[in-house]
Regions:
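Mature catalytic core of soluble alpha/beta enzymes
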Residues: 1-369
Length: 369
């Protein structure tokens, strides 16, 4: 998944649990990575078919190869895709699994690199480019057209051409949370009496307590401070399962959370350049850079509803929820729209999954004026 994964726990055979967890991570990478052409997500992106036509294909072997449009996916991918659509609807599109064309239009990777280096940001895309990407980023283009069969349509008003963008699925916004939960659940099934799994340090799943009976605790980094600055510490529910997700505008390759465990940490905090000379230069560059008719934007987080960088004045959001998928979607959505009604999203999620659900915002850091 292009990031670090840490596991801390007690009970059961530690080495066997770690080896099994590695297998889960590898399997999820094989299914959902947009960088692997053979993954189910990549294959779905490559299928040019809508619910009304096109050829069928299967990810799951001959037993599931039925004629029809789109792509037949595994049971686990089917569940994650259904979750993605449910959360896109519940958040009014603030979370969007089809944001890929907009990310490409804004060249977010280059934007992040420029931010870290403290150099001028790459040129903003034209209004026409943004509008074209926005049309094919509508989450409603993704649909379940049969048993485990999924297709992506093309908007009627979409402009053709060799360089015209096409819908692009990316489950990265919730896959880490799902993987953290799956690894935790497997560890518990294998005898762990207390376990913490951290995927990228921005997605954390826990069960039980630490070996001394105290609750698991996670430190939330301070996006306005240095690389080891902590804005607060969250105690995760003792004796139960819980998931924590942090989304922010400057999360580095190591994520945004660290585990506070008797003075030690699972990995360094995010934003290794925060507070440095390079970071100050980058902040000045961001303040001086305008886009979209003179609009000043604060970071590289794209609002999938408008097609432009979010300007809600929020730097970082942390959510604790009963599900890693729910926590990730909420932290992402609240970053672009802090007015989202969390109880409504949770209620919608509970109806869709037919399971009790809960979520709570445990940290929200606003941008400095």
């Amino acid at each position: 998944m292009g990031t670090r994964i840490d596991i801390i726990g007690w009970g059961g055979d530690g080495m066997s649990i770690v080896n099994a967890v590695v297998g889960v991570v590898a399997r999820h990478e094989d299914m959902w990575s947009v960088f692997r052409p053979s993954s189910e997500v990549s294959r779905l992106n490559s299928v040019v078919a809508s619910a009304g036509g096109g050829g069928g294909a299967s990810c799951c072997g001959a037993d599931s190869a039925v004629a029809g449009p789109g792509l037949v996916v595994s049971v686990e991918t089917d569940r994650l895709l259904r979750d993605a659509l449910a959360l896109a609807e519940a958040t009014g599109g603030a979370f969007n699994p089809l944001i890929g064309p907009l990310v490409a239009a804004w060249d977010v990777k280059a934007m992040r690199a420029a931010y870290v280096a403290g150099v001028p940001l790459p040129p903003a895309p034209s209004e026409r480019v943004v509008e074209a990407a926005l049309r094919v980023s509508a989450w409603g283009l993704l649909s379940r057209v049969g048993e485990r069969r999924w297709a992506m349509g093309t908007p009627v008003e979409s402009v053709g051409g060799a360089d015209a963008p096409s819908p692009r699925l990316d489950l990265g916004g919730i896959a880490k949370g799902h993987t953290a939960d799956a690894c935790r659940d497997l560890a518990v099934a294998m005898g762990a009496r207390g376990v913490l799994v951290s995927v990228g340090t921005s997605s954390v799943s826990v069960f039980g307590t630490r070996a001394d009976g105290s609750p698991w605790r996670a430190g939330l980094r301070d996006p306005h401070g240095g690389p080891t600055s902590v804005a607060g510490v969250v105690e995760l529910p003792a004796g139960d399962m819980a998931s924590l997700s942090t989304s922010g505008d400057n999360l580095g390759p190591l994520g945004g959370v660290r585990v506070v465990c008797a003075g030690s940490a699972v990995g360094p905090l995010a934003g290794s350049v925060a507070g440095s000379v390079e970071d100050r230069r980058a902040r000045e560059t961001l303040r001086e850079t305008s886009a979209g008719g003179g609009r000043i934007f604060d970071h590289h987080i794209i609002d999938p509803r408008t097609g432009y960088p979010a300007h809600a004045g929020v730097r970082q959001v942390s959510v604790v929820a009963s599900s890693g998928v729910l926590a990730e979607a909420l932290s992402t959505a609240l970053l672009v729209d802090p007015s989202i009604d969390v109880p409504d999203v949770v209620a919608h999620w509970a109806r869709e999954t037919s399971a009790p659900a809960s979520a709570k915002v445990v940290g929200l850091v606003r941008a400095e004026s």
